[in-house]
Amino acid sequence: SRRLSRLVRRMLDISQIQNQEMRKEEFDLCESARIALLSMEKKITDRGLDVDAEIPEDSVMVQGDRDLITQVIYNLLENAAKFATPGSKLYLGLTVNGEKAYVTVRNAGATIPAEEIPLLFERFHKSDKSRSEDKDGYGLGLYIVKTILAQHKEQITVTSENGVTAFTFTMQMAR
């Protein structure tokens, strides 16, 4: 029954995100990345992961909903930690190129088959591998990521080869 109430809560979160007015503002993406990373500390430690964080010390000001984008980073980190090989490295990086900021979350673990990648962001999708490894998840975390980024009119890409998987999303730099 606890699992069912968590599922209901996740579905309500999605509904709220889809119907919510975005609070677009200028905010520091570096700060959001650090907050998401800090809130994942216990899960990362429990998996024995090393973190390699390349987050600029200077502010990277972007345009968007701070809370929703922090949720995106958190969900990506949570997924990366969940499917990383215990004791491996988890990477969180933030770079700027022109009008866009790029956030990358990368882990070492099983390679995601190419045919699975387009399905990752579908509601309730769980790969065969994640079904056996992730008993608590619902296949909603990446769907939430996609929903939030679509509201922001931003992109996310996934690469997975030789046991390294990376998710990179864009954010519009503040003017």
Report residues per predicted region:
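Short helix-loop "hinge" at the ATP-lid/N-box region of the Bergerat-fold HATPase_c
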Residues: A80-A81
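Conserved glycine-rich
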Residues: K153-E154
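Conserved catalytic submotifs in the C-terminal HATPase_c
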Residues: E25, T45, D50-V60
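Short conserved segment of the HATPase_c
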Residues: I112-H125
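Conserved micro-motifs of the catalytic ATP-binding
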Residues: Q18-E25, M61-G64
